[in-house]
Design a protein with these regions (language model features):
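Membrane-interface amphipathic segments in extracytoplasmic regions
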Residues: 1-314
């Protein structure tokens, strides 16, 4: 292991304690009936054989750990390499959806973990993977066409310009409108707080993509899975660079970036992320009132439902 176990354990414990304090300070640890205060067991995978629980967050090392959980379920590496079936579909054949009650019981006898990522880096990754590089004839390709028709000037007249792919700025206009109108968000950019309700569950390990190699090495060690799965990150080469962050977020105004902060506010605050490196690359708003309005904006987060139709696009 690249660092001694004690140092890694201390870092992970600090994250866990930080999350508990933040949950309490934000009032998110109090059970209720809305999506932020009600346990959401929908995206959890529970390995009863290995006593391991994972809340799958799309665009946060999800491909790697979906592969790992399929290995734990008994699929061979050779089968997983050759099959045309979607990894999530395979996983759900072995790991049924949990109820609140069954997941609570599993937490009492398992090691539970969550992998998080900077909210705006995750958002950009979702855009690049599912919109910019959408597969032909896919739901995301259809969504991209709809975004262009709505947000690109003259597109309705057949003038798409140089690109038939939505720009990041066009995608963000779509996302902001979705939230303002209370529409369903795609799972690849739904806030983690909505997905995994981390204040409602006592996760043992909160891994960050920034330190993923060490975090998952420690996780595999704690779960006793050395020799069963490997601490790999399958899409690490596709990670978002600082240059890409500047390239894409410089298309947005600072008011828009602040609006995004409000959408992902709890992901920022619960997992100790900031706007450093994002807000400063945004375009200065011509109207100071727009920036002031964004700063004073009430939280935009609304109830998001889960859309199974997107489950084929992991």
């Amino acid at each position: 292991m690249s660092k001694n176990l004690t140092a890694i354990a201390n870092r992970l414990d600090k994250r866990k304690q930080f999350l508990k304090r933040a949950c309490k300070n934000l009032g998110l640890d109090i059970p209720g009936n809305d999506t932020l205060h009600k346990p959401n067991p929908w995206e959890f995978l529970v390995s009863q054989k290995y006593h391991l629980i994972w809340c799958n967050v799309f665009k946060a090392a999800s491909s790697s750990w979906m592969y790992n959980f399929n290995i734990l379920a008994g699929y061979s590496p050779d089968f997983l390499r050759k099959t045309k079936q979607v990894p999530l579909t395979l996983a759900r054949q072995k790991y049924p959806r949990q109820t609140v009650e069954s997941l609570k019981k599993a937490f009492n006898e398992s090691l539970a973990f969550l992998i998080v990522r900077h909210p705006l880096e995750r958002l950009l990754s979702g855009y690049k993977d599912k919109i910019e590089h959408a597969l032909p004839h896919s739901l995301h390709k259809k969504l991209g066409n709809q975004i262009i028709m709505k947000y690109r000037p003259n597109a309705k007249n057949g003038n798409f310009g140089k690109s038939k792919v939505p720009t990041f700025a066009e995608f963000i206009l779509y996302l902001l409108d979705c939230v303002k109108n209370g529409e369903v968000l795609d799972m690849h950019w739904t806030p983690i707080t909505e997905f995994c309700t981390p204040c409602m569950y006592d996760f043992d390990i909160i891994a960050h993509t920034e330190t993923l190699q060490e975090d998952q090495e420690f996780l595999i060690y704690k779960a006793g899975l050395q020799g069963v799965i490997k601490p790999e990150w399958k899409n690490s080469g596709k990670g978002i660079t600082a240059q890409q962050i500047e390239q894409y977020y410089s298309q947005l105004t600072r008011a828009q970036i602040l609006q995004l902060y409000h959408i992902y506010r709890y992901d920022f605050e619960l997992f100790n992320y900031t706007l450093t490196g994002y807000l400063d690359v945004g375009i200065m708003d011509k109207d100071p009132a727009a920036l002031l309005e964004a700063i004073n904006m009430k939280e935009l987060t609304k109830k998001y439902d889960h859309v199974d139709s997107y489950n084929n696009a992991v």
